[in-house]
């Protein structure tokens, strides 16, 4: 009893971000400075392509989307991942809600998507989940699933993103995504350590990427058009 099995340790090494594994299993305290995703890992996952700041299309076709909906001065960001975990779509914009709903529907079509439904995102998600038509095609809207972020659930999703980056399981273009990832830092609170963007900085792309990675790694049944 109380003895860790090698298989359990190896599984933890696979499932946990490097700094969390080191703290829990190797008695190495978390450093006070540094990037939780790892600057060298971010660089290793960055595609050799032009910078992407707003609308960008890669070569692949999305099989999973993550949408972070704008709040106040933030941006709505959508990121689509192809079957290899490479970002193949980036949409970053500020539109009125009705136009946002239209853009999200047309970009996502019948591909499975996670949507941040926290706060103002709730009524937008409800609209996205309603059937809609594009010409002769009717989409059911069932491919959109909402995620309500709490501090703990958001941290868990960021840790999943950190694992994907540190394992080089995903790739993304330079620009808005890498800029946000590189500015993330450890935030220490009375309830523990969290990943966060500095005060006043945007984290919309990181939120969207974390949602897309979660959907890509845990795909549901795909809903189609009729």
Where are these regions (language model features)?
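Structured core elements
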Residues: 65-68, 77-80, 114, 207-210
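Short, flexible loop/turn motifs enriched in small residues
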Residues: 60, 71-77
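Mg2+-dependent endonuclease catalytic cores in nucleic-acid-processing enzymes, primarily RNase H-like
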Residues: 79-191
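Acidic two-metal-ion nuclease catalytic site recognized across multiple nuclease folds
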Residues: 91, 209-226
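A residue-level signal for conserved active-site and pocket-lining positions in enzyme catalytic cores
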Residues: 25, 161, 208
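Short, solvent-exposed helix-loop connector elements
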Residues: 189-201
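Short, flexible loop/turn elements at secondary-structure junctions
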Residues: 29, 69-71, 117-119
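ATPase catalytic-site recognition across NTP-hydrolyzing enzymes
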Residues: 1-67
């Amino acid at each position: 009893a109380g003895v860790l099995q090698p298989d359990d340790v190896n599984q933890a090494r696979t499932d946990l971000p490097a700094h969390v594994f080191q703290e829990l299993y190797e008695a190495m305290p978390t450093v006070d400075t540094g990037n939780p995703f790892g600057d060298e890992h971010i660089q290793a996952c960055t595609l050799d392509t032009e910078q992407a700041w707003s609308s960008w299309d890669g070569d692949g076709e999305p099989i999973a989307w993550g949408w972070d909906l704008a709040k106040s001065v933030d941006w709505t960001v959508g990121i689509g991942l192809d079957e290899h975990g490479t970002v193949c779509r980036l949409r970053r914009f500020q539109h009125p809600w009705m136009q946002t709903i239209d853009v999200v529907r047309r970009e996502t079509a019948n591909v499975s998507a996670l949507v941040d439904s926290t706060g103002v995102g709730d009524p937008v998600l409800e609209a996205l989940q309603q059937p809609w038509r594009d010409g002769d095609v009717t989409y059911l809207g069932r491919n959109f699933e909402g995620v309500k972020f709490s501090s703990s659930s958001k941290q868990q999703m960021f840790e999943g993103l950190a694992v994907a980056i540190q394992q080089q399981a995903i790739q993304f273009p330079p620009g808005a995504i890498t800029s946000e990832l590189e500015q993330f830092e450890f935030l220490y609170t009375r309830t523990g350590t969290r990943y966060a963007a500095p005060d006043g900085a945007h984290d919309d792309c990181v939120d969207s990427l974390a949602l897309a990675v979660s959907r890509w790694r845990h795909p549901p049944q795909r809903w189609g058009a009729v």
